[in-house]
């Protein structure tokens, strides 16, 4: 395999000049885009640095440092997802767990585009460092929060850092790999999940988050930066090596000669390039629409509150203003309509949206459901929640090698969607009670396989559909759609939970005070009422009822999910970083013969011809 990996990028040096010529043409055809920025030169820097990774030694170092960085990010995310539940429980506002998740996802929608576009302008490493600073700030604020509003504020900073580090790590690995091996490289930061599910439960049990959740979060303000240092130093070293080449010196000389515009001109350019107005409109709009859905519930009659109604109406109006702005005024729209008009782009984005929507609607409350209504211990519940990641991470090296052999991904995504349907059916059947343990484990395993076949495959398909100059932008849009799906999925599950759970608890428990405790602080409730007690049985029945509604919605959403997979294109994964030939406006032009419907028709024609020949 090692010789294949080296050979996968052996064409890079010879392809640098060709890639630079293509970018040069784009530069001169888009003078308004490049005249006052370093975007063109940063892309060429990436090309030169990429050639430095031809050695097997440096490829192993890149994958290893990505693994270490991914280990820090993934372990923190896994633990913090659980600690957030204990934090909201300590504020006696556990039902607002989805509110925090929605706030995280809404913030991510805007920040993804900013990171992707600025990384082309200032470089991947600088933005990675900025994201790390946000990560540390958010971690410190969350750990010291004494109320939900303060914790949510910390979540904004933390999530800006989290999505930034993930996106920039993906872009760094994409810059230095060919399409053929792109899946293998991108999964390197995901491999820690082979270990994490088996240690996270023990860590949570030993850390005792019921009492110590604050310190458990705070320690990651220095643990994660330490895990990121190896890849930071590696990139700095490769940049130093690149600076010794003649191409680099020539590039820097050209950059100095063509540097134009002062501070004000560059700020104005960035204002339009980042589409600041569009980012603010979509972020505020989604926040106004989605967050109230997780706050309003029948018990407090907040739906009759004028503030809730006004917020929802304002969000709807702002969304239409956003669409009008993007269509009429935005010089560099968040959603480039010309690019999105091709099914090779909009179909994978639709798959991304429903993939994350289905995941978050089914898993947002999975941990408390396991603890409260399935008699799982905290260790067992943590392992089950993380089991899909373990399955995907364990199978990813073998899947990546298969992809490198076949060089196609569309059928894998279709298979992943079919697996999602089976998974949601199992979650519907095994949604609570003592006999649900094996069924939930089976559903989690299938969920892991579906995630393996769908999530990163869609990213690689989109990157294969665009040129290098568009790769960061389209990857940022893909991440935006993933967070949009996550935000809406978490909002829908939160709305169902807050609208349905209180009444079910009041109905089954017959005690208003006890119902309020079970709703606001379920972890405290289960410590007082053991498994098999009448009160616990009543709560289990309530959880089963609510989970039935949530899983029904999730199962229904797999239908449009499947429809989008059928319309995707299936570009070949070549031995280059991107397709640079057969392109038009930064999009790879593919024939329509690879449409799945055309393939099915061709299959039937082949069968009929065989029958006529007597085969």
From Swiss-Prot:
GO BP of this protein: glutathione transmembrane transport; intracellular iron ion homeostasis; transmembrane transport
Membrane topology recorded in Swiss-Prot or TrEMBL: Multi-pass membrane protein
Compartments in which it is found: Cell membrane; Vacuole membrane
Transmembrane segments: 59-79, 121-141, 153-173, 187-207, 217-237, 276-296, 307-327, 344-364, 384-404, 408-428, 441-461, 548-568
Ranges facing Extracellular side: 80-120, 174-186, 238-275, 328-343, 405-407, 462-547
Cytoplasmic side: 1-58, 142-152, 208-216, 297-306, 365-383, 429-440, 569-615
Keywords annotated in UniProt: Antiport, Cell membrane, Ion transport, Membrane, Transmembrane, Transmembrane helix, Transport, Vacuole
One Pfam family this sequence matches: MFS_1
GO cellular component term, pick one: cell periphery
Main location: membrane
A molecular function (GO) term: glutathione transmembrane transporter activity
Induction behaviour: By iron depletion and by heat.
The keyword Cell membrane is annotated on this UniProt entry: yes
Family the UniProt entry places it in: Belongs to the major facilitator superfamily.
Function: Proton/glutathione antiporter that imports glutathione from the vacuole and exports it through the plasma membrane. Involved in resistance to oxidative stress and modulation of the PKA pathway.
PANTHER family linked to this entry: GLUTATHIONE EXCHANGER 1-RELATED, MAJOR FACILITATOR SUPERFAMILY
Listed name of the protein: Glutathione exchanger 1
Lineage: Eukaryota, Fungi, Dikarya, Ascomycota, Saccharomycotina
């Amino acid at each position: 395999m090692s010789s294949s990996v080296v050979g996968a990028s052996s064409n890079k040096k010879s392809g640098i000049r060709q890639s630079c010529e293509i970018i040069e043409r784009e530069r001169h055809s888009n003078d308004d885009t490049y005249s006052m920025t370093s975007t063109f030169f940063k892309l060429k820097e990436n090309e030169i640095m990429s050639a430095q990774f031809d050695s097997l030694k440096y490829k192993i170092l890149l994958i290893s440092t990505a693994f270490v960085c991914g280990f820090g990010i993934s372990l923190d995310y896994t633990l913090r997802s659980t600690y957030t539940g204990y934090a909201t429980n300590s504020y006696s506002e556990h039902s607002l767990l989805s509110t925090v998740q929605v706030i995280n996802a809404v913030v991510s929608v805007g920040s993804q585009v900013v990171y992707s576009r600025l990384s082309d302008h200032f470089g991947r490493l600088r933005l990675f460092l900025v994201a790390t600073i946000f990560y540390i700030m958010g971690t410190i604020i969350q750990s010291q929060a004494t109320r939900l509003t303060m914790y949510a504020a910390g979540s904004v900073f933390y999530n800006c850092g989290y999505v930034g580090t993930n996106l920039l790590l993906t872009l760094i690995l994409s810059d230095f790999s060919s399409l053929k091996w792109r899946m293998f490289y991108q999964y390197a930061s995901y491999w820690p999940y082979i270990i994490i599910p088996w240690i996270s439960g023990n860590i949570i049990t030993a850390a005792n988050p019921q009492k110590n959740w604050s310190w458990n979060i705070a320690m990651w303000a220095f643990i994660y930066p330490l895990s990121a240092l190896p890849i930071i130093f590696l990139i700095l070293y490769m940049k130093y090596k690149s600076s010794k080449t003649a191409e680099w010196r020539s590039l820097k000389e050209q950059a100095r000669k063509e540097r134009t515009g002062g501070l004000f001109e560059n700020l104005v350019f960035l204002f339009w390039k980042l589409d600041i107005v569009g980012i603010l409109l979509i972020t505020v709009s989604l926040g106004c629409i989605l967050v109230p859905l997780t706050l309003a519930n029948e018990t407090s009659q907040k739906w009759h509150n004028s503030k809730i109604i006004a917020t929802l109406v304002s969000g709807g109006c702002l969304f239409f203003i956003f669409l009008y702005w993007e269509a009429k005024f935005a010089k560099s729209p968040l959603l480039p309509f010309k690019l999105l008009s091709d099914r090779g782009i909009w179909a994978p984005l639709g798959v991304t949206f429903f993939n994350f929507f289905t995941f978050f609607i089914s898993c947002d409350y999975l941990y408390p459901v396991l603890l409260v209504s399935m008699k799982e211990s905290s260790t067992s519940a943590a392992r089950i929640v993380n089991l899909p990641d373990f399955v995907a991470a364990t199978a990813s090296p073998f899947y990546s090698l298969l992809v490198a052999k076949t060089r196609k991904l569309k059928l894998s995504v279709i298979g992943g969607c079919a697996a999602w349907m089976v998974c949601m059916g199992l979650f519907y059947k095994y949604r609570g009670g003592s006999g649900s343990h094996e069924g939930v484990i089976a559903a989690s395993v299938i969920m892991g396989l579906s995630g393996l076949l769908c999530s990163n495959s869609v990213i690689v398909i989109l990157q294969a559909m665009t040129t290098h100059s568009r790769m960061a932008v389209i990857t940022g849009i893909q991440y935006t759609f993933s967070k949009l799906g996550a935000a809406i999925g978490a909002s829908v599950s939160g709305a169902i939970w807050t609208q349905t759970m209180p009444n079910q608890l009041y109905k089954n428990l017959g005690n208003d005070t006890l119902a309020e405790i079970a709703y606001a602080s379920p972890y405290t409730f289960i410590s007082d009422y053991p498994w098999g007690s009448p009160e616990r049985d009543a709560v289990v029945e309530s959880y089963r009822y609510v989970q039935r509604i949530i899983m029904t919605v999730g199962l229904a959403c797999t239908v449009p999910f499947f429809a989008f997979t059928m319309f995707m294109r299936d570009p070949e994964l070549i031995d280059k970083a991107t397709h640079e030939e057969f392109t038009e406006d930064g999009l790879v032009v593919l024939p329509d013969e690879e449409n799945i419907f055309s393939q099915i028709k061709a299959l039937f024609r082949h069968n009929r011809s065989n029958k006529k020949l007597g085969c």
